[in-house]
Amino acid sequence: MMICFVFLCVLTFVRGEIYPSTCPALGAGNGEAVRSGEMLLEISAYRNWRSGKMELWGSAAVNNQVFYGGMEDSQIEYDFGKFLVFRCFQVFHNVHKLLFNTVSSATMHLARKRVQKCGHGKMTFISIQVQCSVNKKSIRLSRMNETNLKKQVLRVAFFLDGSNNSWIADKNFQGEDRTMLRLWTELSTYRQYLISSCNNDVKVLSELYGEFRRMALSYDEELKLNFMPVIRSSSERLFRADDLKCSFSRWLGAEGEFAVCEYSGWGVSKLGKIEIFAEEPLTFDMVWKTVKMRSSGAYTSLFRDDVTWGLISLDKWVGDKYFCMCTNKESGDNVIVTLPEKNVEKSIQIYNEGSTMLAFAEITSIMVNLMFMGAVAVCVGILGISCFVGLKEIIYFIFVSVNSMWPFCNKLLTTAVNCFFKGRTFLRRELKI
């Protein structure tokens, strides 16, 4: 037994790693870092093992407002997060060289083996996260996986101790991982570049934001940078996986009412797709039509989930029914969420307007019905009386009454008598015709 134990220890020492029985638990994250007014810039590089292609990724967040995470070859739209990330493209290039050219093949082999040990084999992330603040700086080296769009992160954080300018490994962040510590040792020569880049980004942040405002406003005059919308109602559905969610909510802002569709979960900013449909009235039918989203994009939360979102203005569409479709582009699965009904105030207004129109219609209908019923009653009365005194006497009575009440009807009565009572002299004499 003792010999076997010694042999196991020697074998473990040669391999350089003791694999734990289970993977480290997922950490809760350091969300307070963003809320404390820090800027975060996350830069990732990974190889798609199916295609063999190297891909780069970046995301930025300021003051708890997550802006955007995009690929290296993504189209740079007019979003501040994208603008900030791709202004730092040199960091992408250096991380690419560092992770896949500088790091020894033995260390990468251990990292890949560690990933396979935890059941991840589809894609492998290696991420460097730079966190900037006045009193604290940190770099997090992460290894992530996107199998089935579920978050599986093995991460070790290193914080800079300001008192003696030394690095401290936070082993309790998500558990000790010797492979990542070894990989970090090889990356340590690059940390000063990352810190200087981080400090420089903080200094020019306000300048970049001002430049973004000028550029964005020149392309979109309706862009509202400081609006604070209020949510009215929301509906959501979970995807087949527990960590994916599709929601559709109705908002009210200064520029009117609008709807926001969000597809959230780990990895959906790259593998997720959303579409918004509106029911449009035609001449004889209703048809569902794809709505062009005025503002759309994907952004990555550094401490929570990825989110793909789209926004439409409801004031520009006549239809009352909308739904959002969230699709996993890799598997083809989708979820459909219907937009909630209109807000209470607008519903009350529409109800009041409808009630007023309905009351007017009811009064008009009652008056028409009364007139019709009166006419029917008169006709029935005339027919009933004619059975006893004869039709000639009734008509005679009507003509005499009209002639006495409205003398100006003489010409009309003369014509009627000539047509219906030719030769009846008694009627002519009585009417003085």
Curated annotation (Swiss-Prot):
For this protein, the parts annotated as crossing the membrane are: 371-391
Key words of the record:
Glycoprotein, Host endoplasmic reticulum, Host lysosome, Host membrane, Host-virus interaction, Inhibition of host innate immune response by virus, Membrane, Transmembrane, Transmembrane helix, Viral immunoevasion
Per the record, what ranges lie on the membrane's Cytoplasmic side? 392-433
What processes does the entry annotate via GO biological process terms?
A: symbiont-mediated suppression of host innate immune response
- Reply yes or no: does the keyword Endoplasmic reticulum apply: no
Subcellular localization(s) per the UniProt record = Host endoplasmic reticulum membrane; Host lysosome membrane
- Which regions face the Lumenal side of the membrane? 1-370
Question: What membrane topology does this protein have?
Answer: Single-pass membrane protein; Single-pass type I membrane protein
- The glycosylation sites are N145, N164
Taken from the UniProt entry, a GO cellular component term is: host cell endoplasmic reticulum membrane
Family of the protein in this entry: Belongs to the herpesviridae U21 family.
Query: What does the function comment of this entry state?
Result: Plays a role in escape from immune detection by associating with and diverting properly folded class I MHC molecules to an endolysosomal compartment, effectively removing them from the cell surface. In consequence, surface class I molecules are down-regulated and infected cells are masked for immune recognition by cytotoxic T lymphocytes.
Q: What is known of its domains?
A: The ER-lumenal domain associates with class I MHC molecules and is responsible for lysosomal sorting.
Q: What is this protein called?
A: U21 glycoprotein
Tell me the organism: Human herpesvirus 6B (strain Z29) (HHV-6 variant B)
